[in-house]
Amino acid sequence: MGRILAIDYGRKRTGLAVTDPLKIIPGGLTTVPTHTLLDFLRDYVSREPVERFVLGLPRRMNYEESESMTYIRPFAVKLAQAFPSIPITYVDERFTSRMAQRTILEAGIGKMKRRDKALVDEVSAVIILQSYLDNPDR
């Protein structure tokens, strides 16, 4: 039984979150420099079984894809080629960064740590993963 791994893909950094082995509880995994992401995922998947990737899909308020898709789409192709046996599900990621910032603030995290963009990316990935877990039959 594999985990589900969520990806909040960014140009510089990518936040990652993963479920527990029973696929009930999402948790932050890490944030990695985007240029090392595929290598990180290869290493992680070699150690931990992953049964699905959940990739944040940036959309505008009118549900059209945002301009960020110009760099996310090529990554999704590379991800599918690198892991042909692991399906990819796309989840709407609108407002995840704002939600992550609010969550960090409400958790009482100190001001300096709240400015850490890597933490925001990781928490955003957790929110994307929770969104998938709430509605896996999308």
UniProtKB/Swiss-Prot annotation:
* GO cellular component terms listed in the entry, alphabetical order: cytosol
Top EC class, one word:
hydrolase
The record, for Pfam families, names:
RuvX
What's one GO MF term for it?
nuclease activity
What Enzyme Commission number(s) apply to this enzyme? Answer: 3.1.-.-
Note the InterPro entries from the entry: RNaseH-like_sf, YqgF, YqgF/RNaseH-like_dom, YqgF/RNaseH-like_dom_sf
Which processes are annotated in GO (biological process)?
rRNA 5'-end processing
- Entry keyword Hydrolase: yes
Q: Which UniProt keywords apply?
A: Cytoplasm, Hydrolase, Nuclease, Ribosome biogenesis
Q: Where does it mainly reside?
A: cytoplasm
Q: Where in the cell is it found?
A: Cytoplasm
Keyword Nuclease part of the UniProt annotation: yes
Quote the function comment for this protein.
Could be a nuclease involved in processing of the 5'-end of pre-16S rRNA.
Protein family according to the UniProt entry: Belongs to the YqgF nuclease family.
| Identification of the protein by name | Putative pre-16S rRNA nuclease
**Species in which this protein is naturally found:** Porphyromonas gingivalis (strain ATCC BAA-308 / W83)
